[in-house]
Amino acid sequence: MPSLSALAVLATPLYRAYFATLRLRGLLADGTTLAPAQYAYGPEIFALCECDAVALAGLIAHTRLTALVALGRDGDWASGILARLGFGLVRGSSLRGGAGALAHLIRAMRASDAPGAIVVDGPLGPPGEAKPGIVLCAQRTGRPIRALGVAARPKIVFRRTWSQIFFPLPFSRVVIACEEPLTVPATTDREGIATLALELTGRLATARQRAQAALGAMRTKGRIDGVVPAYASPSTSAETCAGTQPTSGTLQAPTLGDRR
């Protein structure tokens, strides 16, 4: 049986070809839309939920990212592919190797101006809930945090995974919404870090809602129009990854086992 590293080598060109088919569109906090290649990438930390991870991996075509990847078999598989796609990787999670991984990630970010990326609700959830590690990382590096939210159509949603991670089908429309930067003062105490993590959770939900609204506008008008700026109050309750309901263009994959 081929090793994970061998499978990663074989899968990498397929992932590159797949990502090239996605019709990605970025949505800024003020409602401006642009292609991901037009975004001014800099020393910031992208916060994302695990459900959005596959779609967001396509950003590597436009910039080099430093990402935190969980330990374990699934993490080994993902890191093998991501490394070959050009990601800088640090391994660990809140359950395994967390403190050491955070220290390595901070050093990597201090040594580079490239953006970082952290899945904030892994490795086991709750879905959409930001943990404090990313806030600590922002505090110690002086980098702002940008919450990202994704909507895609058509897609496959793996309903039996804890995060309900989704896979945009080839040639899908994908909208990536980002929020205003969240800054973390160097003097922030433990209570303040917890408060900012809660605020980040809300921003992630808002970003996803804005991405969904923009994608719906694209479907009805053939373009992004009437989208919700990040500073506006959402008209409906924010959704987490697991709380998002199936919409037209969404296929369910109910037989996939939980791959925690």
Q: Predicted regions: what is each one?
A:
Residues 131-189:
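A cross-family acyltransferase "interaction/gating" segment
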Residues 59-62, 84-85, 111-112, 139-144:
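Alpha-helix C-terminal capping segments
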Residues 83-86, 108-109, 163-168:
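Short, hinge-like loop/turn segments at secondary-structure boundaries
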Residues 105-141:
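Catalytic-site beta-strand/loop segments enriched in glycine and acidic/polar residues
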Residues 43-97, 158:
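Catalytic core of membrane glycerolipid acyltransferases/transacylases, capturing the structured
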Residues 92, 119, 147-150:
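Generic beta-sheet signal
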Residues 1-55, 59-62, 169, 201-246, ...:
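Membrane-anchoring hydrophobic helices of lipid-metabolizing enzymes
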